[in-house]
Amino acid sequence: MERTRQRERESNNLFVFSDTISKEAHTSEVFESLLNYSNAETNKPWYHYHNMIDIFKRSHYETFWLEKQIIDQRGITQNLFSNRSKNLYYILGNYGAYDEELAKFYSKNVQSRLKSKNFIVFHLIGSHSWYADRFPKSFAKFKPNDLDFSNLHASSDRDKQIVTDYVNSLYYNDAVLNEIFNLFKDKDAIVFYLSDHAQDMFESGPTYGHRCSKAGLEIPFMIYVSDIFKEKHPEKVKLVKNALNKPFMSDDLIHSLLPLVGIHTKDEVESKNLFSPKFDAQRKRIVCWGSMDYDKIK
C-alpha cells in the first residue's frame, strides 16, 4: 500500500527505480531474456545462454520457486526456468485465488527448509486481466468516481470500471509485496521486485491489456533491503541508491543482480550492470522485436 511503501522509503529500506522497462509486452517473451544472458542484442537462441537459477545452484545457493500462475502452452518459457530450481511449488487455485497465498505457503512450508544461502523466486499473478479477479473484495478501495480519466481513452462506464479494477489490483499488490518484504525483515536479505511487463490501460488507444507500446513496457522495479543487510553491506546499499534514476531495461537484470550479491561469471558485461559506475546509460533500448526505440517515443 502507498502508506506502507512511503514508510519504507522514509526508513531507507525500499528503493524505487524511476525509469525501467521490459523489452516485450508478454510474459513468455520477456522470460526469454529476464533470467539469463540473452538480451535484445544477442543473436543466439535464448536457451543457449546460461541462466540465473543454474548459476545460483553452482554458487551453493538453495533455490526455490513459488509459482502462482497457471502454466499452459503460453507459459512454456517461464516453466523451463522454474524447473531449474531445486525446490518448485505450485500454489494454484486449491490454495486460494490470490497472491497472498504465496507468503502464507512460504511461511508454512518453505521457511524451515532454508539453508545458509538461498535464492527464492515468488512469481505472482499480479495485475493480469481479468483485473477484478486479482484482489479480494476487501481491497476494492477505489470507485470510478475516485479516478481521473482525462488522459485515457476510456469513455464508457465499462472502460472506467476496468481501469478501476486495475487500480484496485495494484492497491492489493502493494499489500502482498509488504507481506513478502516482512518475511525477510529479520534476515540478511535483499529482495528484488519487478513486473515482467506492464498493462496499457487505454493509454495509447481505446484498448487495454498487453500491448507493445510505451505504457505497455514501463514496469515497476524496486529493491527492499533488511536492516541487517543495510548494516552488513552499506557499500551495496550505496550502489543501489546511486542507480535509482538510471535508464534500465530488464533484459540486463542478470548482469546487475549477480554482481550485487557477489557472484561473477565470464558472461557478465559491466556496462550492463546497473549498479556499476561503468553502466552504459546511453544504451539504445530497442523493444518489441526490434521494431521500436523506446527512448525516441518518450
Task: Give the residues covered by each predicted segment.
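Active-site-proximal alpha/beta segments of enzymes that process anionic O-linked groups
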Residues: 1-148, 218, 249-250, 255-276, ...
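Solvent-exposed coil/turn segments that connect beta secondary-structure elements
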Residues: 39, 125-127, 197-198, 226-228
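Active-site-proximal cap/lid insertion segments
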Residues: 72-75, 125-179, 207-220
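Membrane-interface soluble catalytic domains
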Residues: 71, 182-186, 199-201, 209-212, ...
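Soluble non-cytosolic domains of exported or imported proteins
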Residues: 43-47, 96-100, 157-160, 164-174, ...
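Catalytic lobes of large eukaryotic enzymes
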Residues: 219-227
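Short beta-strand segments
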Residues: 65-67, 119-126, 167-170, 190-195, ...
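Metal-dependent active-site segment of extracytoplasmic phospho-/sulfohydrolases and closely related
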Residues: 1, 169-209, 257-258
